């Protein structure tokens, strides 16, 4: 077993980012050998109504289309609803309000070549308490090297919470 193989078998956490005013947070040094990426959210909220999304990128930049899948949302007071994830990224919810906070994780697994499968779960613990589930897929044009947290509109600012990425 080589040192590279041993390192690839270990979870490699990155430095967590405290969200105070950015419109996007980028993790840009994901190695080509990574087969699983976990994005962690703790109390993540924005100052607007654009849905937080995760975008994947390669050497050509972040890809802003071609994401497929669905988001399911349920609560104690309402039946489950299911909608398509935004085509611009993996959405963690369907609609949001300023200050709504989300805690959970998104797991990205390489299924083959540049094709990635996404599975996520979040709790929204402000306003109406909900559970949000995501299943999706994205095929990149080249090897994944970066992950971005932004919003579907791209202009709302994150105003609270912590975001981090690990890979293995």
PLM feature segments, named:
Residues 4-168:
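Surface-exposed molecular-recognition determinants
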